[in-house]
Amino acid sequence: MSFSQESGAHHHPQDYAGLSDEEDEIDILGEDDPCSLKSHFYLQPTHSVMGDSEMLSPSKLSCTESESDSSGESEGGTSKDSSTTPTGSKAKRTLVKPPYSYIALITMAILQSPHKKLTLSGICDFISSKFPYYKDKFPAWQNSIRHNLSLNDCFIKIPREPGNPGKGNYWTLDPASEDMFDNGSFLRRRKRFKRHQQEFFKDGLMMYNSLPYYRPYSAIQPQPVLQQTSLTCMAIPETLPMSTHLAPYPDIKRKVSYPAQGVHRGFKAQDADNHPNNSQSKCSFSIENIMRKPKEPEPNIQSFNSHWNYNHVFQRPSSCLLPAVLNLSTGPLLANTQGARQYNLIQFPGCY
């Protein structure tokens, strides 16, 4: 028993001394490596040196082979991936979306153009050439540019000039939207630009002054409702009553005198027939003439209707147009007539 213990005690130091180099090599792989755990598991003091070496050799070889295989596979995999992956994919991963909105991109494109106007395709070409991110994703964002052009008031659509072939309309910036961005920086916009529809048109037909059917881009000037050239064609007879109040309709028939010249020639013929040129018919003071009511001549119906068409001047609301006509600057029609100066003093009730 003592010999076995001595022999065991004698052989144990040699075993550990002979395997010290192997243990150092195994520890280099890492303490958590499964091969190191196997080596520690096989290192038992009850076995001989040859048995230990024979038992350790397969495990060591298997570990080294597995390590070489694993390292070879990983190296081969990495080399294979590196060889198969193109250089463009790495560049695509590095592309970052620019921090500009679509409105800012469109504004950049329009401002850099010589004529300060571009078509949709021209805007897309500018964005693709300046920003590789949008060049890589070109078809996807073209509709977004189109929607921003149509929905934002800061962009104005300009039709193509006649004789200028091409596809699509031009787009430009509204002159009032120049201060849309803070201090000229396209990264931040102050507020959304809104155009007042009563002052400006949305789709500008106003950019070409040389063409007759376009008008210059400016605020709409209100046109006067009454024009002097059209009102001068309306002739007002000088024999209208000078009363300051409106008489009832039957009284107007009696008070309005017939014009000496004009369209009412039928009245003149009847007046000449019914009133002979003798003083007796005009001045008769007999009892019969006093008691008998003189018979009034019946005028021509056609001329009567045409004559009383002047009554629309005295009826409301058409009578309110008379002061506007008479208060105009004295034109050639009413300049030299005494009745025109008197009409200016007439006050028409109900006109306000």
From Swiss-Prot:
Protein name: Forkhead box protein D5-A
Transmembrane regions: none
GO cellular component: nucleus
Acidic residues bias: start-end ranges: 20-32
Cellular localization per UniProt: Nucleus
UniProt-listed Pfam families: Forkhead
Tissue-by-tissue expression: Maternal expression is localized to the animal hemisphere of the cleavage embryo. In pre-gastrula embryos, zygotic expression begins in the presumptive neural ectoderm. During gastrulation, expression is confined to the superficial layer of cells in the dorsal blastopore lip (Spemann organizer). Also expressed at a lower level in the paraxial mesoderm but not in the notochord. Expression is subsequently lost until after neural tube closure when expression re-initiates in the tailtip within the entire neural tube and paraxial mesoderm, but not in the notochord.
Induction statement: Strongly by siamois, moderately by cer1 and weakly by wnt8 and nog.
Function comment: Transcriptional repressor with a role in dorsal axis formation and neural plate expansion; maintains an undifferentiated neural ectoderm after neural induction.
Low complexity bias: start-end ranges: 73-85
PANTHER family: FORKHEAD BOX PROTEIN (PTHR11829), FORKHEAD BOX PROTEIN D5 (PTHR11829:SF401)
Gene encoding the protein: foxd5-a
Molecular-function GO term, any one: RNA polymerase II cis-regulatory region sequence-specific DNA binding
An annotated GO BP: neural plate development
DNA-binding segment(s): 97-191
Organism from which the protein derives: Xenopus laevis (African clawed frog)
Main location: nucleus
Positions in coiled-coil regions: none
InterPro entries xrefs: Fork_head_dom, FOX_domain-containing, TF_fork_head_CS_1, TF_fork_head_CS_2, WH-like_DNA-bd_sf, WH_DNA-bd_sf
PROSITE patterns found in the cross-reference section: FORK_HEAD_1, FORK_HEAD_2, FORK_HEAD_3
Keywords: Developmental protein, Differentiation, DNA-binding, Neurogenesis, Nucleus, Repressor, Transcription, Transcription regulation
Origin: domain of life: Eukaryota
UniProt KW DNA-binding keyword: yes
Ranges where the record places region Disordered: 1-32, 54-92
